[in-house]
């Protein structure tokens, strides 16, 4: 894992992440007008403040963990939650108008036929069922060994947060 120390190293990892193209980075740098002596942390903070990337994305790149910030055409914006099957991220794509939730099957389950079947069944059910209490699944996608559901993003609070606010009923 390569941890960036200065802005050129940060920008190299940012480009390698796939979040921004080299041209987009050049345009951002022209707009930000950062000094050459800018540290990786200062560069990341400037890109976040200008909304070129999210705090989650900046943190991952600063840690040297730039892989996985793009999954297929989707750009991972932040972690929404995680569980036994994997993680759920908020994501967007240049060719899609809304942010979505990506439910990504954990790497350890990518070769587990039982978990892949479970993900496919969940996708089928989520695409067929229509109910205000069920989040709509838009599609099931795979890129390489990464399998994931693309779902409508519904903002709200978790059950844990609800119980903390209102107490058990």
Q: What are these model-derived regions, one by one?
A:
Residues 1-77:
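Short N-terminal regulatory/linker segments that flank and modulate the kinase catalytic core
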Residues 6, 14, 48, 63-169:
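Conserved ATP-binding/catalytic core of the eukaryotic-like protein kinase fold
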């Amino acid at each position: 894992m390569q941890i960036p120390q200065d802005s050129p190293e940060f920008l190299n990892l940012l480009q390698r992440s796939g979040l921004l193209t080299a041209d987009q980075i050049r345009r951002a740098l022209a707009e930000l007008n950062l000094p050459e002596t800018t540290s990786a942390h200062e560069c990341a903070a400037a890109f976040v403040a200008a909304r070129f990337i999210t705090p989650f994305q900046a943190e991952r790149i600063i840690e040297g963990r730039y892989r996985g910030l793009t999954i297929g055409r989707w750009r991972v914006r932040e972690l929404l939650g995680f569980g036994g099957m994997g993680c759920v991220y908020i994501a967007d794509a240049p060719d899609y108008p809304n942010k979505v939730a990506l439910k990504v099957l954990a790497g350890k389950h990518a070769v587990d036929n039982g978990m892949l079947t479970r993900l496919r069944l969940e996708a089928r059910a989520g695409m067929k069922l229509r109910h205000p209490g069920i989040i709509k699944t838009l599609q099931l996608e795979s890129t390489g060994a990464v399998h994931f559901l693309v779902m409508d993003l519904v903002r709200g609070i978790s059950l844990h947060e609800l119980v903390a606010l209102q107490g058990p009923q």
